[in-house]
Amino acid sequence: MKKTHTAFTEFMQYTALNVLGMIGLSCYILADTFFVSKGLGADGLAALNLAIPVYSFIHGTGLMLGIGGATKYSILKGQKMSCDTNTVFTNTVYTGILAAFIFMAAGFFLSGDITSLLGADRAVFSMTKTYLRVIMLFAPAFILNDICICFVRNDGNPRLSMFAMLTGSLSNIILDYLFIFSLDMGIFGAVLATGMAPVISMLVLSMHWLKGKNRFHLQKTGMSAEMIFSILPLGFPSLITELASGIVMIAFNRIILRLQGNT
């Protein structure tokens, strides 16, 4: 009975801290929406709404790798296979870096085409393109942050994971205000604040390594297709969830643009 009570208490602790952290994580775009609408008006808000689906895709990719890899890590840790846990983390990070560079290349070379595909007209094209390009260039930070958050949480440190997510969100709010209003950086300031948030979050997560609490680390090994394909299905539902919200946003934007235009 005592063991059951302990397991339930631990479960509730992980759940509560994760929910709090995810609420904080959801504030990334919410903060942008508020400050962009106040500082840049209807055109800025339209540009942001058009670009959000791409952010959802990046975030979904990070969650797929993070949740999939961390779940596989927990399974192997429970089986006392500590050598394989390092292989899981290493392959997850390698795959995340590869995916991030694909997003970066698309942002650098195809941001204009993607902006047109999302339905931006002449009035908001420039702002939408700027937001898309910068958010995609920050893809490594978003994806690696998602991976580290999940692994640190499953490594017995859900409190630090939650604190990192909340710190990242709070920094986004502060930087949004600073860049948009104080420094008058416009839409670039909004997306720069959002891109810096996961960097700050990872700095907080680094305490897990600096204090020597980590039970996983990178190791010299090649990418294993077998390992990667055992990780991806575990996190795939998270990608689908983010993609679904992005697709709904694209459909919603197209309907609104057809009926009312940008404003």
Model-derived features: where do they sit?
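Small-residue hotspots at the loop-to-helix junctions and early N-terminal turns
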Residues: 42-53, 128, 132, 191
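N-terminal transmembrane alpha-helices
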Residues: 3-40, 53-68, 72, 97-104, ...
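Transmembrane helical elements of multi-pass membrane transporters/channels
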Residues: 13-32, 134, 145, 168, ...
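Helix-terminus/linker motif at the lipid-water interface of multi-pass membrane proteins
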Residues: 27-46, 115-122, 178-185, 246-263
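Short alpha-helical transmembrane segments in multi-pass integral membrane proteins
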Residues: 1-18, 73-140, 182-236
